[in-house]
Regions:
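Phosphate-binding/switch loop-helix module in NTP-utilizing enzymes
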Residues: 45-113, 119
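Conserved beta-strand scaffold positions in the cores of enzyme catalytic domains, especially
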Residues: 8-10, 100, 152-154
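N-terminal phosphate/diphosphate-binding loop that engages ATP/GTP or pyrophosphate donors
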Residues: 2-49
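Hydrophobic, Leu/Ile/Phe/Ala-enriched alpha-helical segments that form helix-helix packing faces
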Residues: 1, 5, 66-69, 73, ...
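Alpha-helix C-cap/termination motif
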Residues: 3-4, 92-93, 124
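A structure-centric signal for secondary-structure junctions around beta-strands
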Residues: 20-22, 95, 149
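Residue-level preference for the first positions of well-ordered beta-strands
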Residues: 8-9, 96-98, 128-130
């Protein structure tokens, strides 16, 4: 992210070690994570059996993180990067705003407001979004795969090194997406 001057805003999730095994959502603003551990951002638990998500927390805190990320990206687009969206190439030295969604998966399954907010952001061509999505069994991946403008990378142990090498060789982030997207 530093190479391309990406300034992600959005969220990351972090699983705590046992015995708690709680999962917390942490807001990211302009590339800086704001770590806090409260019931207000505890989005689930991961016992040894099946993960359990807390839909009301995703619907409140998760949506708030995404709305603030969108505001941050819009502010960046309106100052300095005016008019730049997914279809245009950013200068390498320009700060490039990105919405970050770390690990969309099973825990969000019942969070309808969160799901609709994520899908609305996915479908907006003004934004670059970097997200990790579970490969199967979630509602997010089928939505992404139906969007012609989405570049979905199925990162595996077999292709990870080559994708990282392509990212290193690219002149800028949009060029990387264009190059790799043609091969998908």
């Amino acid at each position: 992210m530093q190479k391309y001057a990406l300034q992600p805003s959005g969220f990351i999730t972090k699983r705590e070690a046992p015995p708690e095994s709680a999962v917390y959502m942490h807001q990211v603003v302009a590339g800086t994570a704001r770590y806090r551990y409260t019931t207000g951002n505890k989005v689930g638990i991961c016992p040894q059996q099946k993960p359990v998500g807390f839909a009301p927390i995703f619907d409140m805190y998760g949506v708030m993180c995404l709305k603030q990320a969108e505001e941050s990206v819009l502010a960046s687009l309106n100052s300095g990067c005016s008019g730049m969206g997914r279809t245009e190439t950013a200068p390498q030295q320009a700060s490039f705003p990105v919405i970050l969604m770390d690990e969309l998966g099973f825990m969000e399954a019942e969070a309808e407001h969160f799901f609709r907010t994520v899908c609305a952001l996915f479908s907006n061509p003004r934004y670059y979004i970097i997200g990790t999505v579970k490969p199967r069994g979630t509602r997010f991946l089928p939505v992404l795969e139906q969007m012609p403008e989405a570049a979905v990378f199925h990162l595996t142990l077999q292709n990870r090194d080559e994708l990282y090498a392509q990212l290193e060789r690219a002149q800028n982030f949009p060029a990387f997406l264009h190059t790799v997207g043609e091969r998908q």
